[in-house]
Amino acid sequence: YKGGSRNNSLINKKMIFRVLGVLLFIESAMFLLCAAVSLCYGEQDYQYFLYTILLNTLVGGVLLICSRGAENRLTRRDGYCIVTFTWFLFTLFGMLPFYFSGGIPSVTDAFFETMSGFTTTGATILDDIESLSHGLLFWRSLTQWIGGLGIVFFTIAVLPIFGGGTIQLFSAEAIGVTHDKTHPRIDVMAKWLWMIYAILTIAETVLLMIGGMSFFDAVCHSFSTTATGGYSTKQASVAYWNSPFIEYVIAIFMILSGINFSLYFMCLKGKGKRLFQDDEFRWFMKSVSILTLVITFALVFQNHYDWEKAFRRALFQVATAHTSCGFATDDYNLWPSFTWMLLIFAMLSGGCTGSTSGGIKNMRLMILARNIKNEFKRMLHPRAVLPVRVNRQVISPSIIASVNTFFVFYLFCILAGWILLMFFGVGIIEAMSTVISSLGNVGPGLGAFGPAFSWAALPDAAKWILSFLMLIGPVSYT
């Protein structure tokens, strides 16, 4: 080993403890906000948030004490450890208000619901959402907004005070294959992205209130939409309002949240043309448009919807599937069966890199498709030099290899999860759809766990397996 190389290969435990400790204090501040919401509505659930704050700050304080003397450095390995343990700890403490209050009396169900929130999956075990207090409903939606914030939350809330570790944790949370050299420093970029995230949330809140939602419902649904999570304050989800205006607003903001946020930054810099020149953006919009058009025709000619309703329902469901959001306005189990395959394709594809959406990401699909195309060309022209290009940039062989490895890993997770769920008694279709939904952080599945049903009927073992897949999703997709 060269000098220091052995030490550099080790995990910086004290630095990890410090970051996790600070993040737990930030989560406590979020709990305090939810307690204030409960007090505003005259509800007693505020006390359960206070109990959780005490436990949270106690553990956070212990972690900070254990971090004394930490070296001011973070490696990529440290970054992945922080991201993974943050999801787990936030979920572990985030479930406590649900459990303490009796709103979700089962540890398994409370953990599942909270993990689904922080990973922006949107699958729920609740059969009577409206029975929860306003404070718990607000916390439920806030978990998604925090989870959707992802990279921006970690970067601007914690890392600037730790100096050189920013890049490493950024790369553990960020998703992309290239870095534009025209972009500013990562911490500056993160602040701009946070502003964009907040602006989208506020803009949608205003529009939903114009459409007839209360302020509370509008805020909660805006949290879920911009995070592409899908938690609603109503059991019937967005269909509760039966409002075309609200459906169009949410559909549009789901699509906006599925676009690479750095492209919005370029637009703010006066480089709006970059948006329409971006290969991934065009791929994403073409996919949304084609799927919406095909499903619209299917609903008109096979389900006898009128044209406007067919287009609206198709657009909404394609948007929610393609951006891994969990909202629903229709039971697509009643649609033509071939449309299920189209929606599953949208679930697998996900949104753009650098967005709040889950799924495989369109960038990876583009690289895979273009590499396959080149391989077929090489069969005819063995000596041809055929680089894979994205946005006119040549993608390195190492990135292509990592994309291929990712797909193998992804398929392995689907197969393993599918087999395990069937072992515990879940049906073939339901097992496949819930595994794909959890791994892609999508939300509703098919069959008995479609948009019209909760996931409460799943065996406890299946819920723990799916919770683990939800956690793998945001970590592996990076």
Name every feature range the model reports, one short phrase each.
Residues 1-477:
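Membrane-proximal intracellular helices of multi-pass ion channels
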